[in-house]
Amino acid sequence: MMATYIDTKLQNEDCILFYRLGDFYEMFFDDALKASKLLDLTLTGKDCGLENRAPMCGIPYHAAEQYIAKLVAAGEKVAVCEQLEAPQKGKKLVDRGVIRIVTPGTVTEDGNLDKTQNNFIASVYLGKTSGALCWCDITTGQLTVRKCNDKDFISEIYDVLVRVAPAEIIGNGAFRANASESPLIEHGALPKISDYKESAYAVKNAENTLLEQFSVSTLKPFEIENDEESICACGGLIAYLKETQKHALVNVNNVIKEKKEQCMTLDYNSLKNLELVRNMRDGKRYGSLLWLLDKTDTAMGSRLLSQWITTPLISEEKINYRLDGVNELYSSAILRGGIDERLKEIHDMERLAGRISNGNATPADCYSLSESMLALPNIKILLFGSTVKIMQDISDNIDDFTDIAKLIQSAINSDPTTYSKDRNYIRDGFDKELDRLRQMRNHSGDIIKRIETQEKEKTGIRTLKIAYNKVFGYYIEVSNSFKDKVPYNYIRKQTTVNGERYITEELKNVEVEILSADESIKRIEIEIFSKIKGLLAENIKRVQRTANAVSCLDVLCSFAKVAKKYNYCKPQIVGENNAFNVVGGRHPVVEASSYETFVSNDAYINNGDSRVMIITGPNMAGKSTYMRQNALICVMAQIGSFVPAKSAEIPIVDRIFTRIGANDNIIYNQSTFMVEMTEVATILLHATKRSFLILDEVGRGTSTFDGLGIAWAVVEYLAENVRAKTLFATHYHELSELEGVIEGVKNYKITVKELNGKIVFLRKIMRGSANKSFGIEVAALAGVPKVVTDRAKAILKRLEKNDLTRTMLPQNEKPADNVELKEEKPLSDVEEILLSTDINSLTPIAAFKLVMELKEKVEEEHE
């Protein structure tokens, strides 16, 4: 047995092997050592023919899924090796084989999945000058591919990976080598790369894998026919999925090709800082934009919403296509309420279809799908007559499954609690033979009693009885006084003191049927259920198309419900050269999660005289909230949602960049300032005039003058070179002098009010610059001891007298006349040495040596 185990283990070296032995899955050697720690199992040993016993631990087979889930959550792969036959007499070993491999990206059990989130597995192919990545959720069948061929294609690949958030990533050798140095992977923002055979990424092998998967002779319909990188990425992934799942991937029947020019780019920092799908506090949904907007009624709608939020559109036509649908639902309470009620009747059609296609569907799954199918006609009725294109398209893509649904409901019991193991899920009355066998099983006593009565009447033997024993089954017992009346067709089996025992052919036939009824019932129910699953499998594409349409409707309805509740407006999508013009804008999440009335603010940013907003004001006044709310309004508008404002004109944004806050990255030996500058560099290098930038406190991680100089230069570069719409919050009030000097820079401040030495935050933004930071007042609000804040006030007065920043501009010149920072004369080598020397600590000899060194330096400078 151990030899067979070792052979199987060698074929699955990167997995923890669950090896079925009777009622347990056993693990041995290193697998046992690892699993015992991760699963908190008792470690024992087993004789294996070696000098030492093999480490061993095990779990009951019926509890396997919960243990598999724990191992997968810990990043492990699990190979399940099952007994493929029942134990037979004379055969020492039963045949065993690996029936599936469970990895983080291939989990299919409902209990181990978040129903509101896709469980993607991604595959990356990295070439010399371009690359591609694809991602798939095998529970829904969604497969998407994206080609990356810009000069910064590697960064683009990582941006997409962060956005998709796969549970598992595989890739070719070139990508694995690159990923080994990626901070995103080392820091845990992305999972570690799983090894997979390089041959699967060879273009010919990958192409053949895809042709076989989709049963086609060309990949032209999928728009990747001559795209080697996309073919390699997809082919490698499909090969991996087939190898782990051990069955055909029926529901993976299409490839969606995503293009860079179709959607806004959101990098790791933007996704995190804007809290689009997770909050920054604990990484949960609460407090994120997804949490706010997710009022969907179906699990598949919730998953689609998450994808929309992280992939805003950059096509005006497609955005308005969605907005028109939201507007119709927003405007009609009857339509919105009716669809909302009907959607509540829809189960997770996507994942139900996935379980049917991979053979894991239960009778309850099929019945749930039939309930969803029967709810669809009512949705189509509600959409009938709509003149809005997206609503018409949704209606057209919702198919009619009434006949299939009625067949399922006539065949399968509606109450799963009545099911026993492998039986009783087919309704009475659906199959005559099944009904007869159930009657035989459930009323065997009545059947035997009826035969007994018939035999008494035929033979005239009043004492005739039918009984049963384990030796020869049912028999007829006749007392000695009636032996002469026994018919010729009775076959004597046993003589007793008081009479004889007989059998008949009819009785034996009935016995066989009674004793085999359970097995026959099980066989017939399986046959009927297999036919139903086969019928559904034939219609998988129709089910998927319908599920996609219902998901889209669910998201649009969710947008409308949120917009109605919080009084949002329909944004007007304008050309990229138009201004970002929001009247009465609010932060959607802060507004929804606060009991206080949110103070609205306007925003006007264009490509001309007002493209950089310099925002000043004290901490806690609302600068960051204001900047984030405008970025979120961009995102909401471009996913097709109404926005929190009285009115909004939104130009198409290609990327949103954020530079908000920073922490020391000790793992990578990066200080707060280094992290900050890296983020700023990314913005300066990659932002375009179509981008939307929010930068908070640039330069704060270093000395005052260094920080101010950097912040000043960054503003200049953004205004004059990048020309992107920019919100720039700062405590460097000197930057307000740039208005009127650098074209496009405008000053704004968050208003506060001083009352009796205390500050009141008014949260209102207006033109101008703040003349005071109120840092000491904020410190007092935070609970800093009064003795410290009083001392701080005294020091501040002294510093203000010296005016340490007056040298930032040449004396006798107004800011408008000369805004260049005054360059300090560089120090000579001699001056550097003198300034760095502690003269008081020099010995006479050391002083003499220093003078000689300085003399040599001076002579060198004058040669």
Residue ranges of predicted features:
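Active-site phosphate-binding and catalytic loops of NTP-dependent enzymes
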Residues: 104-113, 248, 387-390, 449-461, ...
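Amphipathic heptad-repeat alpha-helical coiled-coil/stalk segments that mediate oligomerization
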Residues: 201-209, 213-216, 265, 280, ...
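ATPase nucleotide-binding head domains, primarily ABC-like/P-loop NTPase cores
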Residues: 29-32, 227, 297-298, 303, ...
